[in-house]
UniProtKB/Swiss-Prot annotation:
Binding site for sn-glycerol 3-phosphate: 16, 84-85, 135, 242
Residues involved in glycerol binding: 84-85, 135, 242-243
Keywords (A to Z) from UniProt: ATP-binding, Glycerol metabolism, Kinase, Nucleotide-binding, Transferase
Protein name, entry field: Glycerol kinase 1
UniProt cross-references to Pfam families, sorted A to Z: FGGY_C, FGGY_N
GO biological process: glycerol catabolic process; glycerol metabolic process; glycerol-3-phosphate metabolic process
Length: 501
C-alpha cells in the first residue's frame, strides 16, 4: 500500500454526532477509516448546537487516523460531505465563529417559519422546492443576525461569512482562501432558487439577510481550492450534502434510480433528471451539478423513525440487549401475526406530515409474542419506505423498477427481503455500504480526472446482494392495506389526548 504508485481519495464525512474520514483507493475500496465523536449542546428546550471548533478538531483527528498508513502526497483529491442545513456564521478576518453552529434538528426558529408558512408558502416552495421549516438554514441565519450582539452590523459591513458545514470546513482547510458551497448544499438553505440556480434576492430581502455573507455556489465536482492542512497542497474537488452524496455513491445517475438510507430515520431520494418536478408531499432538491448552470434534481422523502424504533425496543422496553438481536428474534415467527407497529414517536414525516400522530401497536392477541412485535417493528421500516416511493411514482410519473439500499438496517436480510416483497421490486445492496463517503470521493476524483466518466464509476461499483420479490400480489395488497389502516388510527392521537407536539 505504501508504494507511491497508489493514488488515494480522502472523503471527509461531517455528521451530526461524529466526524469521519474515509480513505479510498482508485478502485473505490476502503483503505482506512478515522472517526471521532463531538458533543451536541442543548442550552434550552428545542435548541441544538455544536461548537464549530470541536467539529474542526474532531475532523482533523479523523483525517490523521485515516491517512496514518500512507504518505499524504499520495492523496490526489479531498471530497467533503456533511450533515445538511446546519448553520455557522464566522468573522471573515479572524475566522472565529460568532455563535455556535445551529443544528438542523434545532426548532427555535419556529415563529419565523410559521410566519413564512402563513404568508409566503407557495412562493418559497416554487422557488426553493422546500417548505418553510426550522430544519433549513435561512431562519437560523436570521436568528443569529437578530439575536447575537453586533453581528448584523458586521454582516452589513461585509465582515461576516455564512456557511453550511461543508463551506466552513473548506474555508478552514484552505486557510480562508475559498468561501464556496455546491448546488446540493445550497439547495438546503431555503435561500437558493433551484430553477435559476442562484441565490434568491426576494427571500434574502424578506429575511433581511445580506447577500455578501453567502458563499459562492459551484458545481459538486470541481477544484474549489487546495488544502494546506496536511503538509502539502491537495485539491478539494468534491462537495455534496450527505443524502445527495449517498445517491451519487449508489451510482443512481439515471432518471428513476432511487436509494433508501436506513438510519435513525430514513431518507429516500429519487433522481428526477434536469427538470425540478414539484411535489405536493415531498421536497424537490438538487442532487448534484457536474457543470456550471446545470443541475440534476431529486425528490426527497424523509421518514422520522426507522432505526430509532429498534433502539426504543432495546432501551425503552428492554426487549433485547443489543440492536442486532432483533433480526433473529423476528425470524422466529413466519409473519407478523396480524400485528402492526406505527413508529410515530414524534409524529409522521413524508408523506403524511402529521406532527400529532403518535406511536401505535395494534392487532395484539393472547397469541402475540415478543417476536411478533420485533417483526412488526422491522416491517414498519419497509411499509414507510413504500409510502414514500408510491408518492414519488405518482407525483413524478416515473416508474421505479429497483431500490438501492444503504445504512445500518440494510445489513438485515429479513428486512431487505420483506422490503422487496412489499414493494414488488428488486432491492439492491452494494458491496461498499459507506455510500455517502464513497459518493463524495467519486465527485472529488471526477474533479481531478482520476475517473473520467459516470460510466467508469458505474463499472467500478459492486453489488453485494439482490433481493427478488417472492410474495404474491394478493398477500402484498392485504399486508399493505393493514398498514394503511394502522396509520389512520395513529394519526392525530396527540390532539385526542391533549399531548404536546
Amino acid at each position: 500500500m505504501n508504494t507511491m504508485s497508489h493514488k488515494f481519495v480522502l472523503a471527509l464525512d461531517e455528521g451530526t454526532t461524529s466526524a469521519r474520514a474515509i480513505l479510498f483507493d482508485s478502485d473505490l475500496n476502503i483503505v482506512n477509516i478515522g472517526q471521532y465523536e463531538f458533543p451536541q449542546y442543548y442550552p434550552q428546550p428545542g435548541y441544538v448546537e455544536h461548537d464549530p471548533e470541536e467539529i474542526w478538531e474532531a475532523q482533523m483527528l479523523a483525517v490523521k487516523k485515516a491517512i496514518s498508513k500512507i504518505d499524504a502526497k499520495q492523496i490526489v483529491a479531498i471530497g467533503i460531505t456533511n450533515q445538511r442545513e446546519t448553520t455557522v456564521l464566522w468573522d471573515a478576518k479572524s475566522g472565529k465563529p460568532v455563535y455556535n453552529a445551529i443544528v438542523w434538528q434545532d426548532r427555535r426558529t419556529s415563529p419565523i417559519t410559521d410566519w413564512l408558512k402563513a404568508n409566503y408558502f407557495k412562493m418559497i416552495k416554487d422557488k426553493t422546492g422546500l417548505v418553510p421549516d426550522p430544519y433549513f438554514s435561512a431562519s437560523k441565519i436570521k436568528w443569529i443576525l437578530d439575536n447575537v450582539p453586533n453581528v448584523r452590523e458586521k454582516a452589513e459591513r461585509g465582515e461576516i461569512k455564512f456557511g453550511t458545514l461543508d463551506t466552513y470546513l473548506i474555508w478552514r482547510l484552505t486557510n480562508g482562501k475559498a468561501h464556496v458551497t455546491d448546488y446540493s448544499n445550497a439547495s438546503r438553505t431555503m435561500l437558493f432558487n433551484i430553477n435559476k440556480l442562484e441565490c434568491d434576492r426576494e427571500i434574502l430581502e424578506l429575511l433581511k439577510i445580506p447577500e455578501s455573507i453567502l458563499p459562492e455556489v459551484k458545481p459538486s465536482s470541481e477544484i474549489y481550492g487546495y488544502s494546506e492542512a496536511l503538509g502539502n497542497l491537495i485539491p478539494i474537488s468534491g462537495d455534496a450534502g450527505d443524502q445527495q452524496a449517498a445517491l451519487f455513491g449508489q451510482v443512481a445517475f439515471n432518471v428513476g434510480e432511487i436509494k433508501a438510507t436506513y438510519g435513525t430515520g430514513s431518507f429516500i431520494l429519487m433522481n428526477i433528471g434536469n427538470n425540478p418536478i414539484r411535489s405536493e408531499n415531498l421536497l424537490t432538491t438538487i442532487a448534484w451539478g457536474l457543470e456550471k448552470n446545470k443541475a440534476t434534481y431529486a425528490l426527497e422523502g424523509s421518514i422520522f423513525i426507522t432505526g430509532a424504533a429498534v433502539q426504543w425496543f432495546r432501551d425503552g422496553l428492554r426487549a433485547i440487549d443489543v440492536s442486532d438481536e432483533i433480526e433473529p428474534l423476528a425470524s422466529n415467527v413466519e409473519d407478523n401475526g396480524g400485528v402492526y407497529f406505527v413508529p410515530a414517536f414524534v409524529g409522521l414525516g413524508a408523506p403524511y406530515w402529521d406532527p400529532y400522530a403518535r406511536g401505535l401497536i395494534i392487532g395484539i392477541t393472547r397469541g402475540t409474542t415478543k417476536a411478533h412485535i420485533a417483526r412488526a417493528i422491522l416491517e414498519s421500516m419497509a411499509y414507510q419506505t413504500r409510502d414514500v416511493i408510491e408518492v414519488m411514482q405518482k407525483e413524478s410519473g416515473i416508474s421505479i423498477n429497483s431500490l438501492k439500499v444503504d445504512g445500518g438496517a440494510a445489513k438485515d436480510n429479513l428486512l431487505m427481503q420483506f422490503q422487496a416483497d412489499i414493494l414488488g421490486i428488486k432491492v439492491i445492496r452494494p458491496k461498499v455500504m459507506e455510500t455517502t463517503s464513497m459518493g463524495v470521493a467519486m465527485l472529488a476524483g471526477l474533479g481531478v480526472g482520476l475517473w473520467n466518466s459516470l460510466e467508469e464509476l458505474r463499472s467500478i461499483w459492486k453489488v453485494d446482494k439482490e433481493f427478488i420479490p417472492s410474495m404474491s400480489e394478493e398477500k402484498r395488497r392485504a399486508l399493505y392495506s393493514g398498514w394503511k389502516e394502522a396509520v389512520k388510527r395513529a394519526m392525530g392521537w396527540a390532539k385526542v389526548v391533549g399531548g404536546q407536539v
